[in-house]
Amino acid sequence: MIDWPTCPAVERDPERVSDAWVFRGTRVPVAALFENLEDGALVSQFVEWFPGVTIEQVRAVLDHAARSVLAPA
């Protein structure tokens, strides 16, 4: 399980986007990144398709997810 509260690139607000984790300052769900990557999109395409999301945010989310997955249990 990924510990999203410790990732500075994301936020969650029960009043927005059904309380989903989103990229900070946007309404773009973090899940959209992983869904698009799974479908074969490039990070550069994702950032182009979702102008409010920065490449730095995407990198931070991917780094955070990787660290969470690789962390010892």
Task: Describe the function of each predicted region.
Residues I2-Q45:
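A short, structured beta-strand/loop element
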